[in-house]
């Protein structure tokens, strides 16, 4: 886990991920910025995961986790056990890409995930966002 408020922690995690990749292992990185805000469907992405992929010329496999906001919300009183639906998409190949290409690759990955979340037939994320709005209204009734 990374302490996002600490540059030392962020750099340490980045270094460990680089080491694992150098040793031939795969890594799973959740690149979302400020993920603790339950009112946002999908935040913009940080660059680190994409920089690592391009640096090592490795493909990126975007994945949508449909039920996270409902099953594992950050306002822990309302979490519950259960299964998560996960969808993986076609890889984004980085062979021949350079650091200057990071913003484009970042946005392609984010859009694939965002489009999947907004077209979920079970509307799990939308339901979770509405639940969160209700929690906030009960907490701050004058808002």
Question: What spans do the regions from the language model cover?
Answer:
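Non-catalytic C-terminal accessory region of glycerolipid acyltransferases
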Residues: 11-143
């Amino acid at each position: 886990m990374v302490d996002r408020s600490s540059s030392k922690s962020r750099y340490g995690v980045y270094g460990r991920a680089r080491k694992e990749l150098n040793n031939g292992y795969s890594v799973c990185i959740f690149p979302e910025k400020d993920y603790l805000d339950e009112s946002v469907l999908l935040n913009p992405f940080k660059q680190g995961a994409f920089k690592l992929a391009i640096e090592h010329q490795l493909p990126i496999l975007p994945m949508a986790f449909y039920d996270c906001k409902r099953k594992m919300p950050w306002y822990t009183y309302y979490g519950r056990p259960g299964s998560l639906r996960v969808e993986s998409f076609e890889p984004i190949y980085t062979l021949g890409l350079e650091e200057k290409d990071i913003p484009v690759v970042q946005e392609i990955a984010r859009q694939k995930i965002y489009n999947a979340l907004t077209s979920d037939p079970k509307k799990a994320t939308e339901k979770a966002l509405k639940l969160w709005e209700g929690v906030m209204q009960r907490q701050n009734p004058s808002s």
